[in-house]
């Protein structure tokens, strides 16, 4: 323990994180890479398991805001590191997770981290309490959680212009601090140097996965999960045009009247800070985007607003009959493990391409040997709404055969009423005994939007518009 505490003193002002100086630096870069005297970690417990050890770490990633703004400024996290007895890779995995700051010491690792670490002979760590929560802001009596915190901090940014406010800044810094701590602890405990990371997280943590990859050169690949919302403004407008309302899942943003800022200079300024699409040139690394076809937050056709413009190696996996809790009752975690193993072992990912034809069909051609190709489809006769909450487990699969031109063509029948959503799923075998499932984007027929989104007639005024 003394040796670990010595590292806290020595490295509080010398972290492994390196800014990506090949790009123009943003306020997010500056926030993440600024020295924070609060950074420290303490090894609370070491647990020996069959073929692995677990390190339970009390991590302080930073100080966020001031005591005049918020009830707790120090961000505390439980960082749980699973280290297999034999480490074969200098790349590890960081999973950014949620949780609340209840002070309870974790009793051990989650089973998934153990399985991933032992299956890949690599270090797998989970970072909790991203964001720290609940948080109570000055002038409010009730604590906020999750999206309610994000929405509040967006509103504060719109009115003040202070880039210390958006919660994504602190969430990103917490992930960077976790990578620092992992490197220090693993090298100290067994002499292994972890040089790179594959970063993953779901929902708000999926967004943080993007921003972490954008600011830290240690990130070798990213796996953002259920955050199908890059290029936010057209994505959200598409959301309303499909539903005619804002889905209940994003009510926290409605309550803070965030949508009334659409089209303003303040909203544009925020997107420059926190929307990965605005710095898409940074994402040359391999990317697996895992989304739920029945997500209650995001429209399944949202990838049309960003995917084609992303550079480098990129893959989609839309999971049928899944909602925002995409792992429940699905094989999504197997896809993530197969992709992670391919990065560790430098196994090339499958090569394939698709074309979204004018007649509504999806044409797929695969250079790599494919095990199975399926078209998944679901129909809603009443609305362009494919949330699992609305249609249940309505997605059905149909096997596709390769034609004489080497193409797999998905051409669903037009629904008698309503709308039909569909996509193509390719299953590839891997050397690891795991199937890797990848998909095309989701299409909808008829490709019509039942509602017309209109921006608020009276837009809000903030730190930029008030200057006029």
Can you annotate each of these PLM segments?
Residues 18-89:
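Catalytic-loop region of hydrolases
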Residues 98-103, 114, 122-176, 229-242:
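Cap/lid segment of the alpha/beta-hydrolase catalytic domain
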Residues 158-203, 219:
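Gly/Ser-rich "nucleophile elbow"/oxyanion-hole loop immediately N-terminal to the catalytic nucleophile
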Residues 211-260, 317-320, 326-331:
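Hydrolase active-site cap/lid region
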Residues 283, 289-291:
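Short beta-strand/loop motif that positions the catalytic acidic residue
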Residues 296-302, 328:
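Conserved alpha/beta-hydrolase "acid-adjacent" motif
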Residues 338-377, 393-406, 411-412:
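Surface beta-strand/loop "capping" patches
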Residues 416-431:
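Short, aromatic- and glycine-rich surface loops/edge beta-strands on solvent-exposed regions
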């Amino acid at each position: 323990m003394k040796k670990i505490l010595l590292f806290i003193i020595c490295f509080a002002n010398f972290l492994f994180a390196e800014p990506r100086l090949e790009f123009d630096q943003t306020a997010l870069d500056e926030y993440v890479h600024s020295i924070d005297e609060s950074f420290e970690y303490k090894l609370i417990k070491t647990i020996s398991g069959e073929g692995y050890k677990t390190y339970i770490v009390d991590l302080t990633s930073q100080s966020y805001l001031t005591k005049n703004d918020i009830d707790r400024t120090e961000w505390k996290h439980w960082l749980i590191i699973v280290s297999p007895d034999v480490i074969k890779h200098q790349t590890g995995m960081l999973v950014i997770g949620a949780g609340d700051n209840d002070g309870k010491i974790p009793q051990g690792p989650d089973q998934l981290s153990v399985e991933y670490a032992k299956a890949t002979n690599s270090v797998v760590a989970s970072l909790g309490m991203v964001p720290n929560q609940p948080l109570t802001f000055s002038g409010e009596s009730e604590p906020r959680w999750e999206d309610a915190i994000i929405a509040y901090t967006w509103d504060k940014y719109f009115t003040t212009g202070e880039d210390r406010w958006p919660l994504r800044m602190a969430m990103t810094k917490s992930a960077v601090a976790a990578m620092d701590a992992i490197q220090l602890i693993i090298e100290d405990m067994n002499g292994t140097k972890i040089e790179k990371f594959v970063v993953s997280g779901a929902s708000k943590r999926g967004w943080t996965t993007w921003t972490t990859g954008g600011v830290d050169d240690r990130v070798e690949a990213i796996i953002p999960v259920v955050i199908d919302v890059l290029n936010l403004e057209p994505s959200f407008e598409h959301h309303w045009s499909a539903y005619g309302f804002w889905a209940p899942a994003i009510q926290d943003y409605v309550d803070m009247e965030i949508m009334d800022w659409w089209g303003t200079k303040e909203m544009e300024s925020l997107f420059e800070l926190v929307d990965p699409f605005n710095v898409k040139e940074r994402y040359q690394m391999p990317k697996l985007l895992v989304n739920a076809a029945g997500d209650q937050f995001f429209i399944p056709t949202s990838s049309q607003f960003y995917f084609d413009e992303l550079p480098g190696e990129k893959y989609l996996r839309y999971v049928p009959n899944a909602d925002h809790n995409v792992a429940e009752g699905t094989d999504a975690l197997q896809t993530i493990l197969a992709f992670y193993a391919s990065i560790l072992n430098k196994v090339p990912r499958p090569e394939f391409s698709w074309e979204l034809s004018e007649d509504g069909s999806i044409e797929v051609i695969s250079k790599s040997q494919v095990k199975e190709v399926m078209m998944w489809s679901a129909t809603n006769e009443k609305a362009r709404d494919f949330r699992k909450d609305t249609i249940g487990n309505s997605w059905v699969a149909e096997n596709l055969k390769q034609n004489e031109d080497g193409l797999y063509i998905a051409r669903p029948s037009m629904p008698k009423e309503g709308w039909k959503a569909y996509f193509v799923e390719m299953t590839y075998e891997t050397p690891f005994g795991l199937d890797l499932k990848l998909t095309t984007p989701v299409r909808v027929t008829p490709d019509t939007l039942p509602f017309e989104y209109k921006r608020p007639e009276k837009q809000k005024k903030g730190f930029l518009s008030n200057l006029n």
